[in-house]
Swiss-Prot record:
Principal EC category: transferase
Matches recorded under InterPro entries: ATP-NAD_kinase_N (IPR017438), ATP-NAD_kinase_PpnK-typ_C (IPR017437), NAD/diacylglycerol_kinase_sf (IPR016064), NADK (IPR002504)
Binding site for NAD(+): D67, G68, R72, N138, D139, D167, A175, T178, A179, Y180, S181, L182, S183, Q237
Catalysed reactions listed for this entry: NAD(+) + ATP = ADP + NADP(+) + H(+)
GO CC terms, sorted: cytoplasm
GO MF entries: ATP binding; metal ion binding; NAD+ kinase activity
Family recorded in the similarity comment: Belongs to the NAD kinase family.
Catalytic activity, EC: 2.7.1.23
The name this protein goes by in its record: NAD kinase
UniProt gene name: nadK
Length: 280
């Protein structure tokens, strides 16, 4: 594989900066042109040409940081064709990043030489009152504001699936099943499956449980006209208000995200639970 490699790095993190410097050193020694994303502000990386993930991403991009860094990068990408991402964990948890920092150089060499498995992750376009807002990677939560009750109706391809009086609902992808949905009692979805998970949050209707639907479904969340004002949170990054009677539509986005995986399926659940226990 040839061509420049872009670098996106978590901000205000000494660990992420140290890992990024190792990555840059290896790339330079390998004769690869290094481009640094416009959001990176470390003086040690200031001497390299800049790029923007939202305008002109190179064909390959290394992301160093945690889940938040990765999710922000994907949101900034918009609906552009995805570069091939390599992800290096330099955050506290990093469920979505499979390369540990101690193996960063070795895996970077594998990345440059094509020794990996490319996995394409679907994303879902989120509409607020008919206007496209973003393509989510993890989840979209429609929740109550100011600790008041949320009343929402959830539809799948036009059919009513849930009436919820409670804290709201989380609509998650397979990748997002270990995030907010899991905290709300939703299932862990094997990463080899391609589905959408609908998880009610603390419903008064105690019989309500998560529903798993096909990835091609169109999910609609309608705020009841009797509901309090709600909040729509996309991937924990973009937040919007939703008035009573407002509608959120979610459907598959045309462009997925390409990620180079190295040991993603090996000991997956062991690694998953190890990272979950890190919250203890």
């Amino acid at each position: 594989m040839s061509g420049a490699v872009g670098l996106v790095v978590k901000r205000r993190s000494g660990i992420a900066e140290d890992v990024a410097r190792l990555v840059v050193k290896e790339l330079v020694e390998s004769g690869v042109e290094v481009l640094v994303d416009e959001t990176v502000d470390y003086p040690s990386l200031s001497g390299f040409p800049r790029f923007s993930i939202s305008r002109d991403p190179p064909g390959r991009v290394v992301v160093v940081g945690g889940d938040g860094t990765l999710l922000r990068t994907f949101l900034r990408l918009g609906e552009r064709e995805s570069p091939l991402f390599m992800t290096i964990k330099a955050g506290k948890k990093g469920f979505l990043l499979d390369v540990e920092r101690y193996e960063a150089v070795e895996r970077l060499r594998d990345f440059l030489e094509g020794r990996f498995r490319e996995v394409v992750y679907p994303r879902y376009r989120v509409y607020l009152e008919g206007e496209a807002r973003a393509c989510m990677f993890n989840d979209t939560a429609v929740t109550a504001n100011n600790a008041k009750m949320a009343r929402v109706h959830v539809f799948v391809d036009g059919d009513l699936a849930m009436n919820i009086d409670g804290d709201g609902v989380v609509v998650s992808t397979t990748a997002g099943s270990t995030a907010y949905s899991l905290s709300g009692g939703g299932p862990i979805i094997d990463p080899r499956l391609d589905v959408i998970v609908l998880t009610p949050l603390n419903p008064v209707q105690l019989f309500l449980r998560s529903i798993v639907v096909p990835s091609g479904s169109r999910v609609t969340v309608e705020a009841s006209v009797y509901s309090n004002p709600l909040v729509v949170n996309i991937d924990g990054q973009y937040v919007y208000e939703l008035e009573p009677g407002g509608i959120v539509d979610i459907e598959r986005c045309g462009s997925g995200v390409r990620i180079a995986r190295f040991r993603w399926w090996e000991d997956y659940y062991e690694r998953l639970y190890t990272r979950l226990l890190a919250y203890w």
